[in-house]
Regions:
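Acidic/polar-rich alpha-helix caps and helix-coil junctions
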Residues: 2-74, 80-88, 97-250
């Protein structure tokens, strides 16, 4: 579905996305079931912040907590910490997640006081989790690469009507603690999909490839989201290759 969408074949992309959905979420015998509220709210120190049951393919890395600590730990200084502007109540978090019931807002962001007595907003998706029964072992070291929710977003993007698009997006919404929506224009649809990529795949890299595929000339500003946008050029979407790989080319 991803490849067909990149190739511009929306009909085939939709067909492939729906095939994954239909085969992966057969009622009563789901291969990739939606995350449950119990897994989100009732697991104490080991919530499934990854929504692991929805992941089609992932990397397994026993050093995941090291990556969390190197990039997202609240004890890092301001030049090292990857985080949003503001805090849970003000800044980018409430702009991106306006509904406080959004599972992703509750599970992926927190505030703590650091060693200089400053309250720090930090990203928690990859915090270490463990429990005596071993329930968290299935997602403790997981880095998601493909999710069932992406199939719904591809289906929404390639749908033939706004009502159909809203139907696919609402499938995600009701499993994120959110109300259903209606869509009134294609511009609104595009904005909703853009925001879903930002919320759903934060810390996973898929938003970058969405922006690249759409060749977006501007992306949301991290400092003043909802107000400013960062201008993009085509070259910004290209990763520099190592000289050892390019020096031998003719």
């Amino acid at each position: 579905a991803r490849v067909y969408l990149w190739a511009g074949d929306e009909q085939k992309a939709k067909e492939m996305a729906l095939e994954v959905i239909q085969k992966g979420q057969i009622t009563g015998s789901e291969t990739f079931p939606w995350i449950t509220t119990d897994a989100v709210n009732n697991r104490g120190d080991y919530p499934d912040r990854i929504f692991s049951t929805e992941v089609l393919f992932a990397l397994y890395n026993t050093n995941r907590i090291s990556i969390q600590n190197l990039q997202y730990n609240y004890t890092l200084n301001q030049f090292q910490l990857l985080t949003f502007i503001g805090n849970v109540a003000e800044g980018r978090v409430p702009v991106l997640y306006p509904n406080e019931n959004d599972f992703r807002r509750k599970l992926h962001w927190a505030q703590r006081v650091n060693n200089t007595s400053n309250e720090i907003l930090y990203f928690t998706k990859y915090l270490d989790v463990t429990d005596t029964e071993g329930i968290s072992n299935t997602y403790r070291y997981m880095f998601p690469l493909i999710r069932i929710s992406e199939m719904y977003l591809i289906a929404a993007e390639t749908a033939t009507t706004l009502d159909e698009s809203a139907e696919y997006i609402n499938k995600i919404n009701i499993h994120r603690g959110l109300p259903e929506i209606t869509l009134s224009s294609s511009d609104e649809l595009n904005l909703v999909i853009e925001n879903e990529y930002l919320k759903e795949f934060l810390g996973e890299g898929q938003s970058f490839f969405y922006f690249k595929r759409k060749q977006m000339t501007s992306i949301p500003s991290p400092s003043r989201p909802g107000v400013d946008r960062v201008l993009m050029q085509k070259g910004y979407y290209k990763f520099p290759l190592p000289e050892s790989e390019t020096s031998q080319r003719n």
